[in-house]
Amino acid sequence: MNNKTIFPYRLFVEGMNDLHVVSSLCENHKLTENFNIEVCGSDKNVIRQFKIAITNPAVYRRIGIMVDADNDVKGRWMQLVDILMKSGKYDCENLELPLDGLVLYPLNSCDAIIGIWIMPNNNLAGMLEDFVLQLVSSENVLMQKAEDRK
């Protein structure tokens, strides 16, 4: 992503690998670079930055977070829903995480639109690396060699 231009759209990610994967996917799919990626350094910092960002609607019009499920995708989801509920800015009643990620519109149009993706696929425990593995064809020669070395 072009981090020299400041856009009103922000994506919070855990680490540099997340930034590189998102940037590569955008480039590969020829998506417009109209958002900035902020590397937060850890899942805790992503959550902290998310809490701060949704309290100030003037800063970002759209806020995305991409965070690893690690061992508990449901727990991670509930953590994020709790933040949204406590903000009072979103209708969280019966809110579920769709397999293709969440886009949540605010109750007041002055507040930010929220996007959530829980790695690897909004459904399973795991992380960025598991997501990337899903992108590789099982017929890939290098992947087969890597699997053989396990």
Give, region by region, the residue ranges found by the protein language model:
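Acidic, glycine-rich catalytic loops of TOPRIM or P-loop NTPase phosphate-binding modules used
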Residues: 1-71
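Activity-critical C-terminal alpha-helical subdomain
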Residues: 75-150
